[in-house]
Amino acid sequence: MRAVVELLAGARRLVIFTGAGVSAESGIPTFRDALGGLWARYDPAALATPAAFADDPALVWGWYEWRRLKVLGVQPNPAHRAIAALSGRIANTRLVTQNVDDLHERAGSRDVLHLHGSLHAPRCATCAAAYRDALPDSVEPEEGRRIEPPRCPACGGQVRPGVVWFGEALPEAALREAFAAACECDLLLSVGTSGVVQPAARIPGLALEHGASVVHVNPQPVRTRHPREHCLVGPAGEVLPELLRRAFPG
């Protein structure tokens, strides 16, 4: 860890790239975790498509509401808090996430780039206007239920979850900003991500190509292929606070 501590202590332009492993440590089921009740009959990937929403909006909206309320029932973990603290230590820090929850924001991170959208930012399926009315915060039954989506105040269209579905492109502006940050950083921390979901998986490679060091933090070893690539094995909630403490003592 010593080499990584020195890299972090000397970093001037930091990118932190997070994936599902960070949220899983707060108790959020990953996308393909086994589901019970109503959802046991469906492949999650089959619910996460524009066609599924067009065919049965109440089913898809109900599933995403179940997921959103699951998120509201958990708290940011030490990894989220350490990531937020790093932005206070390194002024030029950019946080890019593949996660659709709001745990980074609740931990204190600002201006988070959500490459796959957010459960907490629904929009109209017709006119794309942001839906700003309050969503319910009551607990959904564990077995799930169908819920009719609200209507857009602007055009009357159905409101859809604000996530990126299979077959949809990632938000162009967010992806462009993430790629630019990776090309300009001197250190990139890749935390809790499998590194296989394209095009976001290009981000660590772009950082390496442009001269940065890359550190993978993951419970399982990550094969490194470059002298400037490092791997710290362990839960992010343990590794990141220790890394923060050692790089910025006091």
UniProtKB/Swiss-Prot annotation:
The Deacetylase sirtuin-type domain covers which part of the protein? 1-250
Q: Which amino acids does the record list as binding Zn(2+)?
A: C124, C127, C152, C155
Q: Quote the Pfam families the UniProt record gives.
A: SIR2
Any one GO MF annotation of this record: histone deacetylase activity, NAD-dependent
Q: Which reaction does it catalyse?
A: N(6)-acetyl-L-lysyl-[protein] + NAD(+) + H2O = 2''-O-acetyl-ADP-D-ribose + nicotinamide + L-lysyl-[protein]; N(6)-succinyl-L-lysyl-[protein] + NAD(+) + H2O = 2''-O-succinyl-ADP-D-ribose + nicotinamide + L-lysyl-[protein]
**Principal location listed in the UniProt entry:** cytoplasm
The EC number(s) given in the record are 2.3.1.286
Co-factor binding comment: Binds 1 zinc ion per subunit.
Q: Which Gene3D superfamilies match?
A: SIR2/SIRT2 'Small Domain, TPP-binding domain
Q: A Gene Ontology CC term for this entry?
A: cytoplasm
Q: Where does substrate bind?
A: Y64, R67
Per its Swiss-Prot or TrEMBL entry, what cofactor is needed? Answer: Zn(2+)
* Catalytic residues (positions): H116 (proton acceptor)
Q: Which SUPFAM superfamilies match?
A: DHS-like NAD/FAD-binding domain
Q: Where in the cell is it found?
A: Cytoplasm
Q: Which cysteines are joined by disulfide bonds?
A: none
UniProt keyword annotations, A-Z: Cytoplasm, Metal-binding, NAD, Transferase, Zinc
**UniProt cross-references to InterPro entries, sorted A to Z:** DHS-like_NAD/FAD-binding_dom (IPR029035), NAD-dep_sirtuin_deacylases (IPR050134), Sirtuin (IPR003000), Sirtuin_cat_small_dom_sf (IPR026591), Sirtuin_class_III (IPR027546), Ssirtuin_cat_dom (IPR026590)
Going by the record, the broad EC class of this enzyme is transferase
What is the superkingdom listed in this entry's lineage? Bacteria
Where NAD(+) is bound, by residue?
A: 19-39, 98-101, 192-194, 218-220, 236
Q: Give a short account of what the protein does.
A: NAD-dependent lysine deacetylase and desuccinylase that specifically removes acetyl and succinyl groups on target proteins. Modulates the activities of several proteins which are inactive in their acylated form.
The family line of this record is: Belongs to the sirtuin family. Class III subfamily.
Report the domain remarks.
2 residues (Tyr-64 and Arg-67) present in a large hydrophobic pocket are probably involved in substrate specificity. They are important for desuccinylation activity, but dispensable for deacetylation activity.
Q: What is this protein called?
A: NAD-dependent protein deacylase 1
